[in-house]
């Protein structure tokens, strides 16, 4: 017993009260925990994902803002695991403006000019993502498009990781 070390731990900052104030905060934190425990390998550092997680759960924000931050967190999860999306320029033309869609095959943004005739096969790029980042979320539809985008790529890229049904998450 005398050769065992001891730890003295002092809580510097508690995030529990921020998370537990509203139901949505607890639900989002639960989703974060489930996705991390399911898909992240052990003993690997994910500094960017850690900082995005803190950004997602900290602070008092509106429900829309919390959901927007969660969509950004899911994108960081995909990036951390090597399945990041390129939402900064059009995969077809290389232009950085007027990005409206995301290709389900490449995970890259597509401009409205380059997407003519293909709109039904592409995923909608929400205004708050990509190079059109906006602080304010204009509509619930924009958030829904964000969730559809991340859901598609999580199902496509992460489902085979553990070999189980991911349907119950969505």
Indicate where each model-derived feature is located.
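Non-catalytic alpha-helical scaffolds and adjoining flexible linkers that form interface surfaces
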Residues: 1-170
């Amino acid at each position: 017993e005398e050769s065992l070390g001891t730890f003295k731990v002092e809580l510097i900052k508690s995030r529990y009260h921020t998370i537990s104030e509203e139901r949505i905060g607890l639900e989002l934190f639960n989703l974060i925990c489930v996705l991390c425990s399911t898909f992240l390998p052990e003993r690997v550092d994910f500094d960017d994902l850690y900082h995005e997680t803190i950004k997602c759960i900290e602070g008092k924000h509106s429900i829309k803002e919390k959901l927007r931050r969660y969509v950004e967190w899911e994108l960081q999860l995909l990036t951390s695991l090597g399945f990041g999306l390129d939402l900064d320029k059009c995969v077809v033309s290389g232009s950085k403006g007027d990005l409206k869609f995301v290709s389900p095959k490449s995970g890259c943004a597509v401009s409205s000019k380059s997407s003519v005739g293909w709109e039904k096969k592409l995923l909608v790029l929400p205004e708050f993502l990509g190079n059109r980042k906006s602080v304010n979320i204009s509509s619930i539809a924009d958030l829904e498009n964000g969730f559809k985008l991340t859901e598609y790529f999580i199902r496509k890229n992460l489902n085979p990781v553990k070999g189980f049904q991911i349907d119950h998450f969505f």
